[in-house]
């Protein structure tokens, strides 16, 4: 029926919405803006032919005269059949039937309704369904345009029940009956009918339905209603307007007032409980299934796919055989609506589950069968979805994919799937999905996002999975085709990190993905930056170090040392100067560290001196008081530090030369100190002077003012040192040098005697004076009488011998700054040999000259000299080779090197392609090395510019080789000259020459006497015909071949020869070398620098031959110096690159023959400054090594301790060494040093393990809480500090913990954690019981005791958590699980949860600084009170890392234990973090069916029973077993997002709630039976005091 408009209510029909027009489009603007049409013409219009679909008839649209009446007259019910033509009685049809000739006046239409009337869109929208309403005539359109008024505001929201879905039956029936030509007319009188969709209240009453009858009080017209109108008057008493306090106060003052109030409240609670309890038994029965033919079954499925067919009719004939995968496929192929498909699945599932109960099975077995069926059904759903995804590319795949995803998601959220299995399968499928199908899975990921991240078990796996997929996408995305996919993955990872940060705590894979995860965040955003910092810290705290790691933040001293060492390779002094000043705030300590680095015996090379001098100059310019720092360094004294003080004095002399060091200030300090007042006979020689007084003797005086020089001489005289000896020494040296270089220096006085003086006796005052004198002599020798430089061919500035002598003197002094000036003068020479030698000198001291800043300038001067010689037609092959070798070290001179190589190539090509000279035709017959004109003929052949054939080359080569093999021929030609001729011979035919040379060398190796090889090989290497690397490779290839090795006499001697080939000349030996010999030593130095590992191998192979028994007499002479040579090479290699050299010695030499240990020990003893002797190592040696450990000697002390530990000694000695190391670790940790970590780092794993185990034993031996005594506070603080020391040692050596875990540590940690928990409970109880004593002195003692306890509790909890992280592998389940291991794991989790989530006084565990323990060092300037994460958060992260490796059963046991037996910590069950870590606990729908024994199980009965009140339960045990799902504290059984009262239902037993009411999702089924019962669902709607009645 359609109620009259004056009834005051909206009609009970479909909800008001925009109705689609015939064209399928919604004409909302037209419906809202179209005014009312013409009034009705007749109450009973004649039928007209049907021309369109049925429309809603607006019977409330009246004319103006009808609106003046108050109420319309009663009339019979207009029972217009839906099949009649609605247009007959509509104004629209009247307008169409009678065309008007005149436009309709706007005054004839009723005015638009105001907002107080019916909603504007109530019937206007429905009129859009009327044919022609969407196309109004011109007149009405024009009139509407002229009478446009503002639209009325929308009405209030309709009640919820008005949004019921449209009745498909009515619409379908209307469509079927629309073809009836005639209209059915019924004569029954009009009567009011209650709408079928109205809510029914108790007592057959209907809510919100009051039709107008004319008999209401407001319908009575009297004088009062005519004047004042009608309104409901609420009778309000006078008492209601006042406060209730007087009346209630009198009742409460009465003795029985509280009891009466309690009775009222109890009655109210009883009433509420009675109304809130469902007592009626469930009448639900699943709809039956019948056997149908295939045709009928197909017809039934088609009806199911038709939304107009009601489900209640289909529930009568559900066909058999539609189940599992077939059901889903049928729904997909028939396009069954998702809601109806879910209804079918529920019907089939309810019948399947009911079948288990019909067979007479027990309740437990029925539950198991039901769970198995749900798992199988979930598997079918998984296969169905997987099949649709794999069919990508077929027709309608997108629609099928959308349907399949919607259906499976609906089944998931309706709790019709096993959530744990389904989500696990989803993650596995997402992990295995290739990148081409990954977008589909990412779309589905948004559906299950919240469920996947609800628990730690799935959230961590999802985080790792997404990161791995993004990593693969980035690796394969070479052309940015996968950029959208990578962006989508990054978006998911960003959302997970920001919203579910705990799921990104990845103990095992954080190092792998941390950079990738950071790239997904916006590091410019402060929030993102804070999240990633917090996350990095949380992950770092739960990770166990896999390898040895020294302190996280490198000490500034070691950082500065690394900067100093880097200059050797970078040569960037300016950058190192700036970085060093910013690394250390104490500038005096910085200067001290630089001076130690320059003078330490554990670094190699004179380059350090010039590096230190340049840095000190730059620091003084930057404002550092360098003078005071140097004086303070010398005043400390370094007698026992084994420093090379000569390097210190060398630096100071360089500073004095550059006027950077203030000599006057030093002399003032020396006089103020009083050191110079010692007696004359107390110091007879300057070597006994102190360091600060020794500097007085070392100061250069050439550039000092006279008064300063006189003051110095005075102080020396007062110190007992004769200044005349220094002057005599200078004069003697000048006379000696002048005799060697008479063309440069004038003759000296006769009084000067020429003598040789040891270099160690020369002071830097003497060396500096001689160096400047030599430089001055070379410079003045270049000037003529006019004072200008003489540049003329044939008049060189220096001869070759003079240059070699000057270079020998200055290199012996170590005065490379003066040598650089001499080389600069040598560039003006026109002798290619001198220029080549000068370039080789720069190359030999390249690092020092680079630091001085002279290498690039000298190279360019040499290139200019070469260009000058080239213009003059002079070609020097030696100069070109030297310049190429030097230019390769200069990165900015590659273009010049390329030009030089072009010139070298032209020279070689010219020689090889030139036609043979006629002179060479008679060479083979007349050429002989015994000829007196042999050198002249060689010069004529080699430098004539003509060519040479191979036969001529063979003759010359054989003659030179024969001459090279004869020692007596050195009178004619030296070996160096012969090798130079060989180098000149090679360009004519390089390949042929190399073949002949290799054959000759192989012949020498196979000869019985190889003494000539050691004599001829260095010059061959010096001229470049042979390289050291090529010769070593040749020897190794020959020795590897057994056939060739058998032809070589004494093959082991070759290994010794290789060692001797690499040994440089002694430091004190004269370095007067010609160009060939100097180049050989240059090749030695480059080989040692570029091939240190190959050198170590040569040393190892040679040392192994010392004790071999098959040595013959030919190698006796080589074995005599073998140890010394090997030791010299080892010292050079160890000091050049300490870290890598020590690593190699540890891995290769120590494990070799005992002789290797002996030589290595001698080399180390020499460096460390002591000798252990032949006796076995003892503990005193280890203690001495530890005392010598500093920032420079650390690698060598490591190696020395390793040799001591691996020496052939008894186990007692090894244990004593471990004891010494353990004591050193404690001492260094107490003094906050980390040198002990470096000492232990290179020791074998057995020694490291012993040290760590001793620290663990000492740590566990410390009591957690000291007993109460007088010194308790002091003892407690001492015990905490001691435990902190041991914990630091354990943490530094954690890399020695095996992956399989350490036996016994897990049980000890469990006991310690249990003891900590028991102590917490007992102390908390005692504190709560002593509140009445807190006054006066007792109060202070209680507060102090409580503070100490809190501090100890926080420290020990954090310390034990760190130990658990380090020994996490000890808690893993063994291959054969034992009950004891499971119990320990459960106890550990329970203890961590109870302590973490306990509500302690002052929230002690929420403040991490209370622990006073920081596992990682704080940064300088970081004033935060804590590292950034709370101790409580860290504890939960540790628990999460344990849960990741524990089985699911342990999680369930832990949750049940906390619920049943840990009542003091019951609040933890409602903590979201607790649920996050221990879930999922009963995620599936079948896990909720476990009920108490006295309550009928839903699985055992025919249908789910409704819970009964406690009074109706049969007698049972006093403490019935609680359901598993209820004991976990996790809401289960209902869809987690279901917003209904059923989610709060619970079961009662004897008046006490015992668990959640298990609502069964398979029985939440609408239209399950043809006849609706009072309670046909699992939960009666009577719970809400209302139910929905359907026809």
Swiss-Prot record:
It is found in: Nucleus. Pfam families: ARM_SRB8, Med12. SMART domains: Med12. Keywords: Activator, Nucleus, Repressor, Transcription, Transcription regulation. It comes from the Eukaryota. Residues 1-116, 132-176, 1488-1530 are annotated as: Disordered. Residues 40-53 have a biased composition (Polar residues). PANTHER family: MEDIATOR OF RNA POLYMERASE II TRANSCRIPTION SUBUNIT 12. Belongs to the Mediator complex subunit 12 family. Component of the srb8-11 complex. The srb8-11 complex is a regulatory module of the Mediator complex which is itself involved in regulation of basal and activated RNA polymerase II-dependent transcription. The srb8-11 complex may be involved in the transcriptional repression of a subset of genes regulated by Mediator. It may inhibit the association of the Mediator complex with RNA polymerase II to form the holoenzyme complex. This is Mediator of RNA polymerase II transcription subunit 12. It comes from Aspergillus clavatus (strain ATCC 1007 / CBS 513.65 / DSM 816 / NCTC 3887 / NRRL 1 / QM 1276 / 107).
């Amino acid at each position: 029926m359609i109620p009259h408009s004056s009834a005051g209510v909206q009609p009970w029909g479909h909800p008001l919405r925009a109705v689609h027009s015939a064209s399928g489009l919604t004409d909302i603007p037209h419906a809202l803006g179209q005014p009312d049409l013409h009034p009705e013409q007749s109450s009973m219009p004649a039928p007209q032919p049907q021309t369109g679909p049925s429309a809603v008839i607006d019977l409330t649209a009246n004319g103006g005269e009808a609106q003046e009446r108050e109420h319309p007259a009663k009339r019979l019910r207009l029972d217009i059949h839906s099949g009649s033509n609605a247009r007959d009685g509509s104004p629209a049809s009247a307008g169409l039937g009678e065309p008007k000739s005149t436009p309709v006046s706007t005054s004839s239409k009723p005015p638009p309704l105001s907002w107080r009337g019916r909603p504007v869109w109530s019937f206007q929208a429905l009129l859009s369904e009327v044919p022609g309403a969407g196309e109004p005539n011109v007149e009405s359109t024009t009139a509407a345009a002229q009478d446009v008024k503002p639209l009325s505001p929308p009405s209030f929201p309709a009640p919820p029940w008005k949004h019921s879905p449209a009745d498909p039956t009515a619409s379908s029936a209307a469509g079927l009956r629309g073809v009836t030509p005639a209209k059915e007319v019924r004569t029954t009188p009009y009567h009011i009918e209650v709408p079928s969709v109205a809510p029914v209240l108790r007592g057959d009453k209907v809510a919100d339905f009051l039709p107008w009858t004319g008999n209401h009080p407001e319908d009575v017209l009297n004088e009062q209603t005519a004047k004042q109108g009608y309104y409901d008057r609420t009778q309000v008493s006078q008492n209601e307007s006042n406060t209730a306090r007087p009346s209630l106060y009198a009742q409460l003052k009465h003795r029985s007032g509280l009891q009466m109030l309690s009775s009222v409240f109890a009655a109210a609670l009883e009433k509420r409980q009675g109304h809130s309890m469902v007592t009626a038994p469930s009448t639900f029965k699943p709809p039956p299934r019948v056997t149908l033919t295939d045709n009928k079954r197909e017809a039934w499925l088609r009806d199911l796919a038709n939304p107009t067919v009601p489900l209640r009719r289909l529930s009568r004939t559900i066909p058999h055989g539609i189940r599992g995968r077939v059901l889903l496929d049928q729904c997909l192929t028939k396009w069954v609506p998702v809601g109806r498909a879910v209804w079918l699945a529920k019907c089939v599932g309810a019948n399947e589950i009911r079948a288990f109960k019909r067979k007479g099975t027990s309740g437990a077995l029925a539950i198991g069968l039901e769970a198995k069926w749900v798992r199988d059904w979930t598997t079918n759903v998984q296969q169905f979805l997987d099949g649709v995804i794999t069919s990508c590319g077929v027709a309608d795949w997108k629609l099928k994919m959308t349907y399949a995803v919607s259906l499976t998601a609906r089944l998931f959220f309706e709790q019709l799937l096993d959530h744990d299995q389904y989500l696990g399968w989803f993650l596995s499928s997402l992990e295995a999905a290739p990148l081409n199908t990954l977008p589909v899975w990412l779309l589905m990921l948004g559906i299950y996002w919240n469920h996947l991240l609800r628990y730690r078990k799935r959230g961590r796996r999802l985080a790792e999975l997404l990161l791995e997929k993004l990593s693969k996408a980035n690796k394969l995305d070479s052309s940015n085709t996968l950029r959208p996919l990578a962006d989508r993955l990054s978006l998911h990872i960003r959302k997970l990190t920001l919203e579910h940060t705990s799921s990104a705590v990845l103990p095992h894979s954080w190092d792998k993905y941390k950079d990738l995860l950071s790239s997904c965040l916006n590091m410019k955003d402060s929030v993102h930056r804070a999240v990633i910092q917090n996350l990095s810290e949380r992950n770092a705290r739960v990770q166990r170090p896999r390898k040895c790691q020294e302190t996280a933040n490198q000490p500034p001293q070691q950082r500065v040392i690394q900067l100093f060492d880097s200059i050797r390779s970078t040569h960037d002094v300016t950058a190192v100067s700036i970085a060093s000043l910013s690394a250390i705030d104490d500038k005096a300590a910085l200067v001290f560290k630089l001076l130690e680095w320059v003078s330490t015996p554990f670094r190699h090379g004179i380059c350090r001196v010039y590096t230190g001098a340049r840095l000190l100059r730059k620091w003084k310019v930057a404002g550092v008081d360098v003078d005071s720092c140097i004086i303070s360094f010398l005043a400390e004294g370094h007698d026992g530090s084994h420093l090379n003080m000569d390097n210190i004095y060398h630096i100071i002399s360089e500073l004095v030369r550059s006027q950077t060091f203030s000599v006057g200030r030093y002399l003032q300090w020396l006089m103020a100190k009083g050191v110079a007042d010692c007696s004359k006979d107390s110091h007879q020689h300057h070597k006994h002077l102190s360091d600060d007084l020794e500097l007085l003797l070392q100061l250069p005086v050439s550039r000092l003012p006279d008064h300063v020089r006189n003051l110095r001489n005075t102080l020396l005289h007062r110190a007992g040192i004769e200044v005349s000896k220094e002057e005599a020494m200078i004069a003697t040296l000048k006379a000696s040098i002048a005799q060697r270089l008479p063309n440069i220096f004038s003759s000296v006085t006769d009084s000067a005697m020429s003598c040789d003086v040891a270099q160690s006796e020369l002071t830097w005052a003497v060396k500096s004076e001689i160096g400047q004198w030599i430089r001055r002599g070379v410079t003045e020798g270049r000037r003529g009488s006019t004072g200008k430089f003489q540049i003329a061919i044939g008049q060189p500035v220096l001869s070759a011998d003079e240059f070699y002598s000057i270079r020998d003197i200055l290199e012996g002094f170590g005065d490379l700054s003066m040598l650089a000036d001499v080389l600069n003068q040598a560039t003006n020479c026109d002798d290619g040999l001198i220029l080549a030698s000068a370039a080789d000198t720069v190359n030999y001291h390249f690092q020092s000259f680079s630091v001085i800043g002279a290498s690039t300038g000298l190279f360019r001067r040499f290139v200019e000299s070469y260009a000058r010689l080239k213009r003059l037609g002079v070609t020097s092959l030696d100069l070109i080779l030297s310049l190429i070798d030097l230019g390769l070290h200069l990165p900015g001179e590659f273009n010049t090197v390329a030009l030089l190589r072009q010139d070298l190539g032209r020279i070689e090509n010219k020689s090889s392609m030139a036609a043979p000279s006629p002179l060479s035709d008679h060479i083979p017959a007349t050429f002989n090395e015994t000829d007196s004109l042999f050198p002249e003929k060689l010069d004529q052949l080699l430098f004539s510019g003509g060519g040479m054939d191979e036969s001529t080359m063979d003759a010359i080569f054989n003659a030179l080789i024969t001459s090279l093999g004869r020692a007596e021929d050195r009178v004619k030609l030296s070996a160096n000259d012969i090798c130079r001729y060989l180098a000149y011979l090679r360009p004519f035919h390089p390949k042929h020459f190399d073949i002949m040379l290799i054959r000759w060398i192989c012949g020498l190796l196979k000869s019985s006497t190889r003494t000539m090889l050691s004599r001829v090989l260095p010059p061959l290497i010096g001229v470049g015909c042979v390289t050291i690397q090529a010769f070593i490779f040749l020897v190794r290839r020959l020795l590897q071949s057994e056939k060739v090795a058998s032809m070589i006499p004494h093959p082991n001697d070759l290994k010794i020869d290789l060692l001797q080939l690499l040994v440089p000349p002694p430091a004190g030996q004269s370095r007067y070398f010609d160009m060939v010999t100097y180049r050989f030593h240059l090749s030695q130095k480059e080989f040692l620098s570029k091939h240190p590992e190959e050198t170590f191998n040569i040393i190892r192979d040679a040392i192994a031959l010392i004790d071999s028994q098959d040595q013959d007499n030919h190698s006796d002479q080589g074995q005599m110096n073998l140890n010394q040579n090997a030791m010299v090479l080892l010292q050079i290699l160890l000091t050049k690159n300490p870290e890598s050299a020590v690593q190699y010695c540890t891995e290769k030499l120590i494990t070799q023959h005992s002789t290797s240990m002996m030589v290595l020990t001698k080399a180390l003893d020499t460096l460390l400054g002591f000798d252990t002797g032949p006796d076995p190592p003892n503990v005193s040696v280890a203690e001495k090594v530890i005392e010598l450990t500093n920032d420079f000697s650390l690698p060598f002390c490591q190696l020395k301790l390793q040799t001591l530990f691996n020496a052939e000694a008894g186990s007692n000695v090894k244990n004593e060494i471990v004891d010494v190391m353990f004591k050193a670790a404690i001492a260094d940790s107490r003094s906050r040093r980390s040198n002990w970590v470096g000492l232990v780092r290179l020791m074998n794993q057995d020694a490291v393990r012993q040290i760590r185990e001793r620290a663990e034993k000492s740590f566990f031996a410390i009591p957690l809480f000291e007993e109460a005594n007088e010194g308790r506070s002091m003892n407690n603080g001492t015990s905490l500090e001691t435990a902190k020391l041991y914990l630091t040692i354990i943490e530094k050596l954690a890399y020695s913990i095996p992956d399989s875990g350490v036996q016994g540590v897990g049980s000890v940690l469990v006991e310690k954690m249990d003891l900590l928990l028991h102590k917490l409970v007992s102390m908390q109880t005692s504190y709560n019981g002593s509140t009445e004593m807190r006054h006066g002195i007792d109060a202070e003692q209680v507060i102090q005791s409580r503070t100490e306890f809190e501090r100890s509790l926080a420290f020990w909890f954090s310390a034990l958590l760190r130990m658990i992280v380090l020994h996490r592998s000890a808690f893993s389940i063994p291959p054969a699980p034992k009950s004891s291991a499971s119990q320990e794991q459960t106890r550990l989790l329970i203890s961590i949860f109870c302590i973490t989530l306990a509500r302690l006084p002052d929230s002690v565990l929420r403040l991490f600084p209370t622990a006073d323990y920081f596992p990682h060092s704080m940064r300088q300037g970081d004033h935060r009170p804590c590292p950034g994460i709370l101790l409580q958060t860290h504890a939960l992260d540790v628990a999460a890392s344990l849960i990741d490796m524990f089985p699911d059963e342990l999680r369930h046991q832990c949750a049940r234990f906390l619920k049943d037996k840990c009542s003091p910590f019951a609040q933890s069950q409602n903590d979201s973090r607790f649920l996050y870590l221990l879930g999922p606990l009963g995620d599936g729908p079948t896990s909720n069916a476990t009920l108490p024994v006295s309550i009928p199980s839903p699985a055992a009965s025919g249908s789910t029973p409704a819970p009964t009140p406690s009074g109706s339960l049969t007698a049972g045990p006093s403490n019935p077993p609680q359901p598993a799902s209820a004991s976990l504290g996790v809401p289960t059984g209902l869809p987690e997002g279901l917003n209904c009262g059923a989610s709060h239902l619970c079961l009662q037993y004897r008046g006490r709630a015992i668990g959640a009411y298990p609502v069964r999702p398979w029985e939440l089924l609408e239209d399950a039976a043809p006849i609706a019962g009072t309670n046909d669902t699992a939960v009666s709607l009577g719970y809400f005091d209302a139910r929905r009645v359907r026809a």
